[in-house]
């Protein structure tokens, strides 16, 4: 450590901030701090002289200016007005320094808190300001430890000794040489000891001082180290003990020491609030802080012990249950009182986990109870304990104690008829004659309980316990799957549990059951008298060791925890269990099988079971009468609007739901059943507060007190659909009403209120007295207020900011919306039917019983229960009868979806998507085999057709017998007339309806039946959203809807390009989103529409044969410029003649008349490019299934990482099934699933505005680089790494010496700060970093970021070599066998003089913060330093080295032999002759400190680190560019979870994902944190992408546009990109040397564009640049203008590439004198035709006409060859859209791998 040099002038006094100030003789009644500076005792002549010349307080004086703070004051004196801990400094008026503490090279003053200003720091009296320990006692460090005894004298003795040893504390001398540091530090330590600070010095035994407190959260740990520090300082006796009292009384000296050290190591800003509260009362009461801290430590210890005890509970009945209960409840109460809340669920889990023995089965009973409490659990424990105590001597025991087994080796067997044994002592009999009892209980397979038992030692063969595979019913039995399940952690896999309490054998697997048959008369109950459903009964056959076979009866049920083998049934076949020998044996002693003891149970292996050939359908399909078969719970759950199981059971028990009873439902899966639609639709943050309204109203009669609230608006809906709804809830009955609203106007609200009041008055003969509402304008307006006043109704408004009072209406709206989202998610119906889902939910909710009242709202209102047979699941597919068809041969059925029962008739409201209307009708048939969204999730075999038929049979019979068929059904919510639609499109509708019910559909033949009511299964799918502007009447649903309309390849041209049918196809009817064979005879559901209008497209018609007829249909064929266009974004096309269009079919690549001197120019350009090799594709024939296909209008505006604007996305029709890599990435969410769950691919544009959303952000300019440097305090002051700290200190001295050597500032004069204009004063700082080669570097820099504009010339620029120039030079070096030499110029900027008059503060080690020095050199960080250095080195290279700068490319210099690329202080030299490089180096060394990093003279592979690129170069062969080492170091520091699932990504993103642009709701602190995180992540990704990972630029650019919109989705996509970078960090950009026979250089730009796939229909454009077949750069960006067609987007992309292509051409010609050929490659033939066309009239009126004309002139004037490239070979495709894995790899694996 260096000394503190305060000044170079001797008259400035020196001293430490911690040194005491001693005065001369002072009277006892006088404050020593009032003594003037002239009376301070001088300690040498120099200081005497200095003091005589001063008129103010010396710089080192510790005398404060506010004298009242230094005088003794009682603890009651309030703290200063600026707060309890204002920073104050011990200084004179001219020495203000805002910088505060500065630890290495400290400034001349130190700020002081009220600690230091207190009387304890400067105690009054004649003694010195820093009390000294008497010589008899010594310093705290020199005395024995407190354990050896107390050696302190009393306070009077200490005072006298200190008074006698009074002396002035002399500061240490100045350090003048590094060699003197050992001697100097000894004097410095002596100085600290004399200043009563010896306790902070590490002792000889190495005991450290306490660390600095840096956070309030660290205070508990810090105070432990501080107490240890006091103990090491022989002050352990003053520390409070457990009872809060110290061993001895603290002296004044010790209190001073305690006070000083506490304030040094615990800065006030880092103290906890409770510590600050103590100090605010008495800022000297450190002892109270220590006492309180020790109390907290003891409390934390008790809490930890309680938590450990609770987590390790063990109970087996050996102790009384009361004692166990008391112990547990006391622990829980203590934890709750200490703020650690243990809820019932957690407590029950912890208790049950510790149960063993007879109590272990209670682990699973919780699955049969909802919300089990601790008290309920202990009731069960007490019941078992009492039963255990009562039957200990009388109960037959099959698992005896070892003492019992000595006397009797045989277990007791009962050969009599099995009888029921109940655990509950209150229920000993069972009324059912054929009742068996299972010893364990049914449980879920996913039980989270754990087992603490371990397998006991056994003489039997070892058993494999790690089989975790589940053998499901119906799975083929193999040897490897005998151990089929592991249902719980304490089960022994592959074994049967031997149970003496079970009267029947039960097994979960059907594969061991022989002769299975149903037996509905058997009723099995568990220990808690709950029914266990039985699927079948059969025989269990054994083949034992003695080759004997036997069988017993077995019951099949999946609802048990273990497979149970009844000892009673074994005894019936003469088999007993001997637990002494641990074997099964016959009565004659023949051993049959070993027994294994595992945990508390005994087991026998399943290997002795004979498997059967029975299949699962045989078990499940055993004939059972419909009268006895129970309804599956998932079916009832969906039928009743996805209500929870508890509510449904209450409703059935209380008959609020009629037609069947609670026993008719299979509740076995109700507890563990998770409905995916409920999880998605009902996801919520937290629950509303219940019971809060009770303080606002009294008790009312039914329908006298109503709650109301309005929800909405719902955006992007058709005009016919409501945007709001208003709900009403009766306080007493909880009856609900909902009414749709299209707006929130006063008259609309008034109409609803009039309706609801009239309904209640007429139907319930009640009068509404009070209506509770919020303070929305729709309720507080004068019109409604007068209406309520007129009707005598009191409006009850919620108070401001008291939303709790409106809990009833809020909870109802939340419940209805949860149900709505769930119903829409489950059914797949469009969003404009949302209110129908609300109505359906309201009907059901009014019929469900409340758990509190045990009645439903309908029962409270006096209404009958809801007949469930009148309900259909929401969205149930049906076929509606068309009562008025267009003709007699017209199909009579229309596909539809059931919504809810009609309010106005006995009919049902059904949605007809083909007609865009809903009808009220009874003329419908349920469509079998289709459970709407059940195919989306794995519902196993949940098909409810039979259940639905049984349920609705009585209702349909009622309709058939009692209702007269109406001639006209009631139409509601119709967008247009039903009959008129049929008349407009008769042929179209006929095709649709015939397809919808065609028996030749793709359903397997086995699904057809002879029942006339059953309709064949069809893949009908409700559309996710319907555009209100679509006029087609045949919008049929598909099973899965693709986010991107599929484009089929219609014809393969002779050139290899693809003509695409420019019409989106509906997704086919299959599980996967793929097309079947085009020649398949199965029909497909396509969309039909009218023919295209002439003003939209210029099509020729291709004849297509229709199915089953001789007439030819025509499919519109797109013209050439339409091949890249999507119908959803149609724009006026360019009219091209037929001859021009046809000519494009045969000329590939296309040549211009004036740019093709040779026939094979274009071929040679394409031949050298790293394009993918594609297998030849046969011509694709059109399918007979094609009809006239309509467009789909879409208004999608979501920002995309692929999807709807993807002009190059298509699907090959003749492919039977596309592979996984063609459709999706390895992310498990597919494109279809993502869009179904998160997006609305047919939604209109959103009107919401996002907060913090910017319209467009440039990828690089918006990114802040990651800070890799350290500040002075981080590198040295607070650096805990001693070795690293030493290296940084060495780097610091090296930098200072370099600055002095370079004469960076004027050392002859120091300026006073007041003399200099403040705007010319530049702040300075030291920054430290660790370079990639491991060296530590320090840099003294100026704060140019706050530099005044008047101090530099804004016109000067700091130039560095462009990355394209470096890549071009490297590429030419490889092709021409150049030597590459890398140089570094040390402190380059310091070689440049500075013209302006600027001043900086001196470095910290000088200690001259009040002085300034004038700069002479361009210090790093100044605005002008870069420009000054550039001019300096440029002048030297030109004049002394004979170089010249390449025009247009700054920092690129060349002469006849050498090329130099300059990047600040790094130089890269390229030359054919290595001696030429050496000559340049010799010249540079004459002027600059030049270091050779890599001479590059080896002929083997040479590794470089050039500007962040890790380059491997072997002259004449190859060059590889990567960043593996850098990424390996940097990415883990980003705190991104890497490889969370242990797998690697194969693509950086997923096709078809859209960034949701809804309003971002986030608090400000979290927003700033996430923006900062995005800046770090995208900053690193951008750095890597623009260096060499050009394949990632699209993703980087898209995410960079959302840096200021850090939603969860954006962050997840960014994490995925970083994950891909990590997985592919070893990838390199590969270059190979060009063929030596090539006569010229070839510079090519490949262009591509994705039309309208960015927000607001902006297009993404991308370009890749190649030199001699080597990729040297790429660019991906969003088009600045909104393009109106694909052609315009392609023209925009090409025009963006031309300027850079021309500049690169000039650079290549300057560096290499070979001729150059320039090429432009695109996959847009329409763009090429425009460029080569001479006809200007055809696009004169187009939006892009001027840009096209300019592009044509540039192509002609710059001799550019425009060539066509196949889309599948266009590697620029990766710049414009996310691609499937296979395509992404195909386009990139040749140039980066």
Swiss-Prot record:
Residues of the active site: 499
Major location (coarse): cytoplasm
Subcellular location(s) of the protein: Cytoplasm; Nucleus
Residues annotated as domain RNase H Ty1/copia-type: 1648-1790
Polar residues compositional bias, start-end: 1-10, 48-60, 127-152, 1043-1053, 1092-1120, 1133-1144
Residues binding Mg(2+) 3, per UniProt: 1648, 1690, 1723
Domain Integrase catalytic per the UniProt entry, residue ranges: 698-873
Gene3D superfamilies: Ribonuclease H-like superfamily/Ribonuclease H
Role description: Capsid protein (CA) is the structural component of the virus-like particle (VLP), forming the shell that encapsulates the retrotransposons dimeric RNA genome. The particles are assembled from trimer-clustered units and there are holes in the capsid shells that allow for the diffusion of macromolecules. CA also has nucleocapsid-like chaperone activity, promoting primer tRNA(i)-Met annealing to the multipartite primer-binding site (PBS), dimerization of Ty1 RNA and initiation of reverse transcription. The aspartyl protease (PR) mediates the proteolytic cleavages of the Gag and Gag-Pol polyproteins after assembly of the VLP.
Protein name, entry field: Transposon Ty1-H Gag-Pol polyprotein
Source species of the chain: Saccharomyces cerevisiae (strain ATCC 204508 / S288c)
């Amino acid at each position: 450590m260096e000394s503190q040099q305060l000044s170079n002038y001797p008259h400035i006094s020196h001293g430490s901030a911690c040194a005491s100030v001693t005065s001369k003789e002072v009277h006892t009644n006088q404050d020593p701090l009032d003594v003037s500076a002239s009376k301070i005792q001088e300690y040498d002549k120099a200081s005497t002289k200095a003091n005589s010349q001063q008129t103010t307080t010396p710089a080192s004086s510790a005398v404060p200016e506010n004298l009242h703070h230094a005088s003794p004051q009682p603890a009651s004196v309030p703290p200063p007005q600026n707060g309890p801990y204002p920073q104050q400094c011990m200084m004179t008026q001219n020495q203000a320094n805002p910088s505060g503490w500065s630890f290495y090279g400290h400034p001349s003053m130190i700020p002081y808190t009220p600690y230091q200003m207190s009387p304890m720091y400067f105690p009054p009296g004649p003694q010195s300001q820093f009390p000294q320990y008497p010589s008899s006692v010594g310093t705290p460090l020199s005395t024995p430890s407190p354990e050896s005894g107390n050696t302190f004298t009393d306070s009077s003795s200490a005072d006298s000794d200190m008074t006698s040893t009074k002396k002035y504390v002399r500061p240490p001398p100045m350090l003048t040489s590094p060699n003197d540091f050992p001697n100097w530090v000894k004097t410095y330590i002596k100085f600290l000891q004399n200043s009563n600070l010896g306790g902070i010095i590490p002792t000889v035994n190495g005991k450290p001082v306490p660390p600095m407190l840096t956070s309030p959260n660290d205070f508990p740990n810090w105070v432990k180290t501080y107490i240890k520090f006091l103990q090491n300082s022989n002050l352990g006796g003053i520390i409070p003990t457990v009872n809060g009292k110290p061993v001895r009384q603290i002296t004044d000296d010790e209190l001073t020491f305690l006070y000083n050290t506490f304030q040094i190591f615990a800065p006030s800003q880092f103290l906890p609030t409770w510590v600050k509260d103590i100090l605010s009362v008495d800022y000297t009461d450190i002892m109270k802080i220590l006492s309180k801290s020790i109390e907290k430590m003891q409390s934390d210890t008790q809490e930890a012990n309680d938590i450990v005890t609770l987590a390790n509970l063990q109970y087996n009945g050996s102790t009384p249950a009361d004692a166990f209960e008391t112990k547990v409840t006391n622990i829980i109460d203590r934890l709750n009182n200490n703020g650690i809340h243990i809820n019932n669920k957690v407590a029950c889990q912890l208790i049950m986990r510790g149960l063993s023995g007879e109590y272990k089965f209670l682990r699973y009973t919780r699955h049969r109870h909802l919300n089990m409490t601790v008290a309920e659990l202990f009731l069960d424990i007490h019941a078992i304990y009492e039963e255990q105590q009562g039957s200990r001597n009388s109960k037959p025991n099959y698992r005896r104690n070892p003492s019992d087994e000595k006397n009797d080796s045989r277990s007791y067997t009962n050969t009599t008829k099995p009888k029921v044994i109940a655990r509950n002592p209150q229920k000993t009999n069972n009324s059912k004659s054929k009742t068996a009892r299972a010893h364990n209980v049914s449980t879920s397979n996913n039980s989270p309980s754990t087992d603490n038992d371990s397998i006991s030692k056994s003489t039997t063969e070892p058993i494999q316990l790690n089989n975790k595979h589940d053998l499901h019913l119906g799975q083929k039995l193999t040897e490897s799957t005998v151990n089929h399940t592991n249902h719980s952690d304490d089960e022994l896999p592959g074994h049967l549990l031997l149970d003496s309490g079970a009267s029947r054998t039960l097994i979960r697997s059907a594969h061991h059951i022989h002769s299975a048959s149903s037996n509905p008369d058997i009723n099995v109950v568990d220990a808690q008298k709950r029914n266990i459903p039985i699927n079948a009964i059969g025989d269990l056959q054994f083949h034992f060791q003695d080759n004997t076979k036997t069988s017993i009866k077995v019951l099949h049920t999946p609802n048990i925890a273990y497979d149970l083998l009844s000892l009673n049934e074994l005894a019936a076949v003469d088999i007993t269990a001997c637990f002494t020998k641990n074997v099964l044996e016959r009565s004659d002693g023949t051993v049959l099988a070993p027994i294994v003891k595992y945990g508390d149970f005994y087991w026998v292996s399943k290997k002795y079971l004979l498997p059967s050939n029975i299949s699962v359908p045989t078990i499940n399909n055993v004939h059972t009468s419909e009268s006895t078969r129970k309804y599956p719970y998932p079916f009832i759950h969906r039928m009743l609007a996805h209500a929870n199981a508890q509510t449904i059971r209450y409703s059935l028990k209380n008959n609020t739901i009629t037609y069947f009873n609670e026993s008719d439902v299979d509740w076995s899966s109700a507890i563990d059943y998770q409905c995916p639609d409920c999880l998605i639709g009902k996801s919520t943050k937290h629950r509303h507060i219940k019971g809060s309204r009770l303080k606002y109203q009294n008790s009312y009669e039914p329908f006298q007190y109503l709650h109301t609230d309005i929800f909405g608006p719902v955006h992007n809906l058709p005009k016919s659909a409501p945007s709001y709804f208003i709900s009403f809830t009766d306080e007493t009955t909880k009856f609900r009403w909902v009414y749709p609203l299209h707006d929130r106007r006063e008259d609309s609200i008034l109409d609803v209120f009039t309706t609801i009041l009239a309904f209640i008055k007429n139907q319930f003969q009640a009068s509404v007295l009070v209506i509770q509402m919020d303070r929305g304008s729709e309720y507080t307006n004068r019109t409604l207020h007068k209406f309520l006043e007129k009707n005598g109704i009191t409006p009850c408004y919620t108070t401001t900011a008291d939303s709790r009072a409106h809990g009833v209406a809020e909870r109802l709206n939340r419940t209805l919306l949860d149900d709505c989202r769930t119903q829409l998610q489950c059914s797949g119906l469009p969003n404009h039917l949302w209110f129908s889902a609300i109505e359906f939910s309201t009907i059901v909710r009014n019929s469900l019983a409340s758990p509190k009242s045990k009645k439903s709202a309908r029962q409270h209102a006096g209404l009958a229960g809801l007949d469930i047979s009148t309900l259909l699941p929401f969205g149930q597919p049906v076929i509606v009868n068309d009562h008025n068809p267009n003709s007699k041969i017209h199909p009579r059925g229309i596909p539809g979806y059931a919504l809810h029962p009609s309010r106005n008739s006995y009919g049902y409201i059904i949605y007809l998507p083909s007609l865009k209307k809903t009808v009220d009708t009874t003329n419908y048939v349920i469509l079998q085999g289709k459970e709407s969204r059940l195919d989306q999730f794995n519902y196993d075999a949940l098909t409810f057709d039979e259940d639905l038929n049984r349920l609705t049979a009585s209702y349909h019979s009622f309709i058939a017998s009692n209702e007269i068929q109406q001639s006209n059904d009631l139409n509601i919510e119709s967008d247009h007339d039903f009959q008129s639609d049929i008349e407009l499109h008769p042929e179209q509708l006929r095709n649709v309806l015939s397809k919808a019910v065609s028996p030749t559909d793709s359903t397997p033949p086995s699904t057809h039946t002879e029942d006339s009511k059953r309709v064949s299964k069809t893949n009908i799918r409700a559309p996710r959203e319907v555009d209100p502007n679509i006029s087609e009447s045949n919008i049929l649903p598909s099973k899965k809807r693709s986010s991107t309309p599929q484009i089929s390849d219609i014809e393969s041209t002779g050139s290899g390009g693809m003509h695409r049918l420019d019409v989106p196809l509906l997704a086919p009817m299959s599980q996967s989103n793929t097309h079947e064979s085009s020649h398949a005879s199965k029909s497909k559901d396509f969309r039909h529409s009218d023919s295209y209008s002439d003003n939209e497209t210029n099509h020729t018609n291709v004849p297509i044969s229709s199915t089953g007829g001789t007439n030819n249909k025509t499919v519109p064929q797109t013209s050439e410029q339409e091949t890249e266009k999507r119908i959803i974004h149609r724009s006026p096309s360019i009219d091209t003649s037929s001859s021009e269009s046809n000519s494009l079919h045969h000329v590939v690549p296309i040549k211009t008349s004036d740019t093709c001197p040779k026939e094979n120019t274009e071929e040679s350009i394409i031949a050298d490019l790293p394009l993918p090799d594609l297998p030849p594709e046969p011509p694709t024939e059109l399918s007979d299934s094609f009809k006239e296909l309509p467009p789909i209008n879409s208004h999608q505006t979501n920002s995309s990482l692929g999807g709807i604007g993807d002009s190059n996305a298509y699907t090959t029709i003749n492919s039977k099934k596309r592979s996984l890599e063609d459709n999706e990435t390895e992310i498990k969410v597919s494109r279809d699933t993502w869009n179904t769950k998160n997006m609305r691919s047919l939604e209109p544009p959103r009107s919401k505005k996002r907060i913090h959303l910017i319209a467009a952000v440039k990828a690089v300019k918006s990114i802040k680089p990651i800070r890799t440097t350290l500040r002075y305090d981080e590198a040295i002051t607070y650096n805990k790494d001693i070795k690293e700290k030493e290296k940084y200190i060495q780097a610091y001295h090296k930098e200072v010496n370099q600055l002095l050597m370079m004469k960076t500032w004027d050392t002859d004069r120091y300026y006073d700060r007041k003399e200099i204009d403040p705007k010319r004063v530049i702040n300075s700082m030291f920054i430290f970093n660790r370079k990639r080669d491991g060296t530590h570097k320090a840099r003294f820099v100026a704060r140019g970021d706050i530099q005044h504009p008047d101090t530099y010339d804004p016109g000067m620029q700091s130039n560095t070599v462009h990355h394209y120039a470096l890549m071009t030079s490297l590429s030419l070096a490889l092709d021409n066998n150049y030597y590459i030499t890398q140089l570094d110029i040390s402190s380059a900027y310091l070689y440049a003089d500075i013209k302006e008059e600027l001043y900086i503060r001196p470095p910290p080690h000088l200690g001259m913060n009040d002085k300034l020095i004038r700069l002479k050199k361009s210090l790093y960080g100044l605005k002008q330093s870069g420009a000054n250095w550039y001019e300096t080195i440029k002048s030297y290279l030109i004049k002394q080295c004979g170089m010249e700068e390449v025009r247009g490319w700054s920092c690129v210099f060349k002469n006849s032999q050498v090329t130099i690329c300059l990047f600040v202080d790094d130089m890269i030299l390229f030359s054919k002759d290595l001696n030429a490089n050496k000559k340049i180096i010799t010249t540079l060394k004459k002027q600059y400190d030049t270091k050779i990093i890599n001479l590059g003279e080896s002929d083997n592979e040479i590794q470089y680190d050039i500007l962040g690129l890790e380059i491997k170069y072997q002259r004449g062969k190859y060059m590889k560019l990567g960043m593996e080492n850098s990424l390996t170091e940097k990415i883990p520091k980003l705190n991104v979870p890497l490889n969370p699932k242990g797998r690697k990504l194969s693509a950086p993103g997923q096709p078809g994902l859209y960034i949701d642009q809804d309003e971002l709701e986030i608090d400000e602190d979290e927003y700033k944190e996430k923006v900062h995180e995005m800046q770090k992540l995208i900053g690193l990704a951008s750095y890597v992408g623009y260096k060499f990972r050009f394949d990632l630029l699209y993703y980087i650019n898209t995410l960079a546009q959302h840096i200021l919109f850090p939603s969860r989705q954006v962050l997840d996509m960014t994490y995925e990109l970083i994950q891909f970078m990590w997985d592919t960090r070893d990838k390199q950009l590969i270059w190979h040397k060009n063929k030596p026979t090539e006569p010229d250089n070839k510079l090519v730009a490949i262009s591509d564009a994705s039309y309208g796939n960015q927000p607001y229909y902006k297009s993404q454009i991308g370009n890749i640049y190649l030199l001699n077949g080597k990729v040297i750069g790429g660019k991906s960006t969003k088009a600045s203008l909104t393009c109106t067609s694909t052609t315009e987007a392609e023209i925009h992309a090409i025009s963006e590439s031309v300027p850079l292509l021309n500049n690169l051409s000039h650079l290549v010609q300057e560096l290499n004198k070979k001729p150059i050929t320039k090429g432009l490659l695109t996959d847009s033939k329409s763009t090429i035709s425009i460029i080569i066309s001479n006809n200007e009239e055809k696009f004169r009126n187009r939006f892009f006409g001027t840009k096209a004309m300019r592009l044509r002139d540039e192509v002609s004037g710059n001799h550019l060859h425009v060539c066509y490239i196949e889309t599948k070979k266009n590697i620029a495709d990766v710049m414009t859209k996310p691609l499937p894995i296979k395509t992404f790899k195909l386009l990139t694996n040749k140039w980066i791998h």
